[in-house]
Amino acid sequence: KETKFLNKITKHRKLIKYSYGKKNSYIKILDIKKINDEKKITFKLKNKIYVLKTSLIGEIQIKNLIFAIIAAHLSRLKIKDILKTIHKIKTIPGRIQKIGKLKNKSKVFLDYAHTPDALKTVIFDIKKEYPLADISLVFGCGGERDKKKRPIMGSIASKFCHKIYLTDDNP
C-alpha cells in the first residue's frame, strides 16, 4: 500500500526514491541473524558487503536504522564511519525499550503503544524476537479519550498474550 502510493508521488514529481530490501534497492539486506540480545545484519551497498550489529528490536526500528544509514551515506558520510557509530544507537525511551530482566531470565520491555495497531505491532515484534516466550502484558487505556479502542486492545492482548494485567489507568 505505502509503496504504490510513494511510487505514484515520486514518478509524478520526478523525485528520486531510495529503498532497501528489494533487488534494485539502494541497500539490499542479505541476512539478519539474532545472536543473544543483538542482531547481526549483513547488507549490500554499491556491490560491497557490510555487517552491522545492533541491539534494536522490531521491524520498524530496524527499518529506521537502515534508512538512517541511507540518509547518512547520501549526505556523503563514508560507510566505514557510519558503521563505527550506528551500532551505538539505542531505542527511543518507551519504544520497545528493554528495562529489566527477572530472576527467571524473562525480559521486561516498555512501550507506550496507544493504539490497537501499535499494540499488535509491539506484541508481534517481541514474538518474532523471542518466539518461544510467553508474553505477559501490563497495559491500560486511561483517560476519557478514545474509549472505543479499549475493547479492541483488550481483544488483541487476550489473543496474543499469555497473561494480561489490566490497569484502570496507564501503568
Stretch-by-stretch model annotation:
Residues 57-60, 74-78, 114, 145, ...:
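Catalytic cores of large soluble enzymes that bind and process phosphate-bearing ligands
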Residues 65, 112, 169-170:
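Generic detector of well-ordered alpha-helical packing
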